[in-house]
């Protein structure tokens, strides 16, 4: 099985360590397929996906179809005669006509311990849900949403203060290692496929900005998990005096008060009452202001005890 012709499909930063691992191993990556360049940031400057940047740095041909399922795109992929397609956070559903092309199928690197957290945002939802362990699963793709046979699993603990960004960075490397192990087993003829138990699954849908609105009637740990799971995007938030207050890092405490009311505001942070305790906001950003540690923010912006955080009026 030496010299497999591999097509890599991926788009964001999460996919880059796996592509780099393939290149470091000397695999024959014949093409990279990624999403089109898109406007990003406040200036809406059109930027290439990170995977495209990495591929071009190594002289690999890049395709950027608007829709990978259209017949002419499928046929252009077929003409490349890949033995294997590796998919990491590509961002489009692959049709059966494409899945059937490579001799050894299409292998996906998914950022959860399947069958838990199928879907687009597994990193966020496992943290929001308060889980203490997650990982990466490689799987043989089928036409369902993350329903294919599992191949290799790598687990890792989730730190109590870890947010989605740091978990993303760690799992991107774990995913690359899991894919390398999967290829070694495939090459040796020792790859074992394990069916997923649909009864054990849960879904991780794409997040929307409004999902980050904090409900102060929840318990401290629930709110902390939401903040961790929403950082860096789409961000947890509340409103203070009609202005959006983005909240990036919090601790839990045992303060008492009406949910959403400010208990104290000082160098240690902004303490806000919730159900069964309180939240100490440690890092925040008020609408129109810079992101700051709470102590630095409060040195120049006074918030009186009794002030209310909540929904926009």
UniProtKB/Swiss-Prot annotation:
Keywords: Protein biosynthesis, Transferase. (6S)-5,6,7,8-tetrahydrofolate binds at residues 112-115. InterPro entries: Fmt (IPR005794), Formyl_trans_C (IPR005793), Formyl_transf_N (IPR002376), Formyl_transf_N_sf (IPR036477), Formyl_transferase-like_C_sf (IPR011034), Met-tRNA-FMT_C (IPR044135), Met-tRNA-FMT_N (IPR041711). CDD domains: FMT_core_Met-tRNA-FMT_N, Met_tRNA_FMT_C. GO terms for molecular function: methionyl-tRNA formyltransferase activity. The keyword RNA-binding does not apply. It holds the Pfam family Formyl_trans_N. One of its GO terms (cellular component) is cytosol. It comes from the Bacteria. Its EC number is 2.1.2.9. PANTHER family: METHIONYL-TRNA FORMYLTRANSFERASE (PTHR11138), METHIONYL-TRNA FORMYLTRANSFERASE, MITOCHONDRIAL (PTHR11138:SF5). HAMAP family: Formyl_trans. Attaches a formyl group to the free amino group of methionyl-tRNA(fMet). The formyl group appears to play a dual role in the initiator identity of N-formylmethionyl-tRNA by promoting its recognition by IF2 and preventing the misappropriation of this tRNA by the elongation apparatus. Belongs to the Fmt family. This is Methionyl-tRNA formyltransferase. It comes from Geotalea uraniireducens (strain Rf4) (Geobacter uraniireducens). The gene is fmt.
């Amino acid at each position: 099985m030496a010299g497999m012709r591999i097509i890599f499909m991926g788009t964001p930063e999460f996919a880059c360590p796996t592509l780099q691992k393939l290149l470091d191993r000397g695999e024959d990556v014949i093409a990279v397929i990624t999403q089109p360049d898109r406007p990003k940031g406040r200036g809406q400057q059109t930027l290439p996906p990170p995977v495209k940047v990495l591929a071009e740095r190594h002289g690999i041909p890049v395709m950027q179809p608007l829709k990978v399922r259209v017949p002419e795109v499928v046929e252009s992929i077929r003409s490349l005669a890949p033995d294997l397609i590796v998919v990491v956070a590509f961002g489009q559903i692959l049709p059966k006509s494409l899945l059937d092309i490579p001799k050894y199928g299409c292998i996906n690197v998914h950022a959860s311990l399947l069958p838990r957290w199928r879907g687009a945002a597994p990193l966020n939802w496992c943290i929001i849900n308060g889980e203490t362990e997650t990982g990466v699963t490689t799987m043989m793709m089928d036409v369902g949403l993350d329903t294919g046979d599992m191949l290799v699993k790598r687990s890792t603990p989730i730190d109590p203060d870890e947010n989605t960004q740091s978990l993303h960075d760690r799992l991107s490397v774990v995913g690359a290692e899991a894919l390398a192990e999967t290829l070694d087993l495939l090459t040796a003829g020792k790859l074992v496929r394990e069916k997923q138990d649909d009864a054990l699954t849960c879904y991780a849908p794409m997040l929307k900005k409004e999902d980050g609105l904090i409900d102060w009637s929840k318990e401290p740990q629930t709110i902390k998990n939401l903040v961790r799971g929403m950082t860096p995007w789409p961000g947890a938030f509340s409103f203070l005096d009609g202005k959006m207050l983005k909240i990036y890092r919090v601790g839990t405490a045992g303060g008492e008060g009406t949910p959403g009311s400010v208990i104290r505001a000082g160098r240690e942070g902004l303490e806000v009452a919730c159900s069964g305790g309180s939240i100490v906001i440690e890092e925040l950003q008020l609408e129109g202001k810079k992101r700051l540690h709470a102590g630095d923010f409060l040195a120049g912006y006074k918030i009186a005890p009794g002030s209310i955080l909540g929904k926009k009026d």
